[in-house]
């Protein structure tokens, strides 16, 4: 915890949204239902604190994601990769995971500032309708 308190994560959308990323041309050819446009801007990187304080609760949350966090600024690559793998495994431990079972007319809300989310299926054979609303503070 002490070592990560002021550490900055190197974030990029390249793993998902670059031409060769998970949602790039090969994924599109495989029949993905959503039209995702890849872009070279996905190759850019941005630094973000690894440990962030939630502005409402004051609680500290990890801000790392296997899809977006490439490493830790200023750390040797091997140490950075080892720590990233540890953090990814830590945040996916069963006591931190909520899995939802959908039913008709259900509404689910979450706070992206303190969790990661993923669609893991479970709706095969059913119509999937998603309305996304993003609420943000003005900067």
What do the PLM-derived regions correspond to, one by one?
Residues 1-107, 112-139:
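Non-heme Fe(II) oxygenase catalytic core, chiefly the N-lobe of the double-stranded beta-helix
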């Amino acid at each position: 915890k002490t070592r990560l308190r002021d550490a900055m994560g190197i974030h990029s959308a390249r793993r998902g949204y670059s031409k060769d990323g998970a949602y790039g041309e090969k994924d599109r050819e495989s029949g993905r239902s959503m039209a995702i446009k890849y872009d070279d801007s996905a190759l850019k990187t941005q630094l973000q604190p690894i440990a962030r304080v939630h502005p409402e609760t004051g609680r500290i949350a990890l801000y790392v994601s296997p899809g977006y966090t490439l490493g830790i600024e200023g750390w040797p690559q091997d140490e950075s990769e080892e720590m990233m793998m540890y953090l990814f495994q830590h945040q996916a431990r069963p006591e931190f995971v909520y899995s939802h079972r959908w039913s008709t007319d259900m509404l689910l809300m979450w706070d992206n500032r303190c969790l990661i989310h993923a669609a893991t299926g479970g709706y095969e054979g059913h119509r999937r309708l998603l309305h996304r609303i993003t609420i943000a503070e003005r900067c």
